[in-house]
Amino acid sequence: MSKCHNYDLKPAKWDTSQEHQKQRSALPTSRPGENGIIRRRSSIEELKISPLFVVRVLVAAMTIRFTVITLTWLAVFITLLCNKEVSVSSREGYCGPCPNDWICHRNNCYQFFNENKAWNQSQASCLSQNSSLLKIYSKEEQDFLKLVKSYHWMGLVQSPANGSWQWEDGSSLSPNELTLVKTPSGTCAVYGSSFKAYTEDCSNPNTYICMKRAV
C-alpha cells in the first residue's frame, strides 16, 4: 500500500483585514446626492446678506434720491429766477432806435452838445433835430444823469405870467423831480449834477442837452 500523506484539509485562513481596508477606502465617503446638497448649501450661504449691508444700500439709495430731488428743485429755482431777471431787464432796458451818436436810455434818446449857445439858440438846435431841451421827469428812469458834472441848458424856464417854473411842454416843475437853486437874475435853468438845476441868465452861453422819445 502506498503511504498516505497527511494533508491539512482545514480551510485556509486569508488575511482579509488589508483587503477590507482597501475596499472601504475605495467606497465613496458620502452618500449619493450629498455633494450636490453641500454645494447648494454653500450657494445659499453665499446669497445670505448681512443686515448691515442692507442698511448701507438703503442709505445710499436715499442719499441719491435726495440729491436728485435737490438738484431738480435748484434747477427750477434758477430757471425761474433767470427768467424773472431777463423779463425785468428787458422791460427796463428796452430802447428803440436813436439817431447816430445819440445815447439811448430807458426808451429815450439823449445828445450832449459841446457848443456854447444861449438858451433860445440851444432850444432851436434841438427843435431842428426833432427834439427838445432836457426834461427831468423821473429820477429812477433818468438815473444816469446824476453822473453829469458840467452845466448844460435844459428845457426849464420861468413863466413871465406868474413866475412859476415850467418845462417847454407847459408842465409845471415838481420838487420831487429836481432841486432848483435860484439866483436873482436867472429865468432859465442849467442842469448841474445829482438832479440839481441852477437858474441863470438865458443869454449866457452854455452847452446843452437835447432829448427825444425813442421810436
From Swiss-Prot:
Membrane topology listed for this record: Single-pass type II membrane protein
**Side Extracellular, residues:** 75-215
Which residue stretches belong to region Disordered? 14-35
Localization (cell): Cell membrane
Which residues span the membrane? 52-74
Disulfide-bonded cysteine pairs: these are: C95-C104, C98-C109, C126-C210, C188-C202
Give the primary localization class.
membrane
Q: One Gene Ontology cellular component annotation?
A: cell surface
Task: Tell me if RNA-binding is a UniProt keyword of this record.
Answer: no
Q: Which PROSITE patterns match?
A: C_TYPE_LECTIN_2
The Swiss-Prot or TrEMBL record annotates one GO molecular function as:
MHC class Ib receptor activity
Q: What protein name does the entry list?
A: NKG2-D type II integral membrane protein
Give residue ranges for domain C-type lectin: 105-211
Tell me the residue ranges located in the Cytoplasmic compartment per UniProt: 1-51
Instruction: Output the GO biological process annotations, alphabetical, semicolon-separated.
Output: adaptive immune response; cell differentiation; cellular response to lipopolysaccharide; defense response to Gram-positive bacterium; natural killer cell activation; natural killer cell mediated cytotoxicity; negative regulation of natural killer cell chemotaxis; nitric oxide biosynthetic process
Q: Which PANTHER family match?
A: NKG2-D TYPE II INTEGRAL MEMBRANE PROTEIN (PTHR47494:SF1)
Q: Which SMART domains would you find in this protein's record?
A: CLECT
Assembly and interactions?
A: Homodimer; disulfide-linked. Heterohexamer composed of two subunits of KLRK1 and four subunits of HCST/DAP10. Interacts (via transmembrane domain) with HCST/DAP10 (via transmembrane domain); the interaction is required for KLRK1 NK cell surface and induces NK cell-mediated cytotoxicity. Can form disulfide-bonded heterodimer with CD94. Interacts with CEACAM1; recruits PTPN6 that dephosphorylates VAV1.
Glycosylation is annotated at N120, N130, N162
Looking up InterPro entries in the UniProt record yields:
C-type_lectin-like, C-type_lectin-like/link_sf, CTDL_fold, NKG2D, NKR-like_CTLD
